[in-house]
């Protein structure tokens, strides 16, 4: 299993959620404060657990980047060794 995190500015949240619902089976969203080039901004951390292909997550992040007219959206990927769904 893989944990992906997408970090983006907290604007167009309803449209971001629509993109996520259309492209992912499940996800969670956390409100955060981020800093980009010295400027503090409200941001979102989108966490996705699953067996998605990396390119699919990059595609989703790209849709969010275009929607929010951002220079960059950070995506992290962590391979999980042990996990349980109880």
Give a label for each model feature.
Residues 1-86:
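Positively charged, small/polar-rich N-terminal and surface patches that mediate targeting and assembly
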